[in-house]
Amino acid sequence: MKIFHAILLIVTGTALAADLPRSPAPAGARATIISPLDGATVSSPVTVQFGLRGMGVAPAGIAMANTGHHHLLVDADLPPLDQPVPADEQHLHFGKGQTEAVVTLAPGKHRLQLLLADHLHLPHDPPVVSQPITITVRQE
């Protein structure tokens, strides 16, 4: 019976999330990774600076037009855009309105991309994303 309830909760939650309206983004709004630069070789931990044009930054839970908060995708493709951004080691949330983060990464190549989301962690419509960058973390 517990398994049935767990499955029901997952199915219902996914269906409800898919029904949430996405916040509109102004035309031309875009996220950028200011630093590190694409192709950079860096040491870990890595300081990642977030940029945003055409919108403002607001903490998660604060519903204000034309604002959102950053999510840093690490070695991950864009998640489904009609659902809240997952919270795991590949989808880092910055729900306090941070515009910079210090991220510990293993040595090797890594792909980073920013995705802005609204107060409910839903990506905007159209999505506000950065171009992905690739960095190499050197072995120390």
Report each predicted region and the residues it spans.
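Short acidic/polar inter-strand loop motif in beta-rich domains
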Residues: 79-81, 117-128
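Beta-strand signatures of extracellular beta-sandwich domains
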Residues: 69-73
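Short amphipathic, basic-aromatic surface patches that mediate peripheral association
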Residues: 51-62, 122
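Short, well-structured beta-strand segments within conserved domains
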Residues: 46-50, 99, 108-116
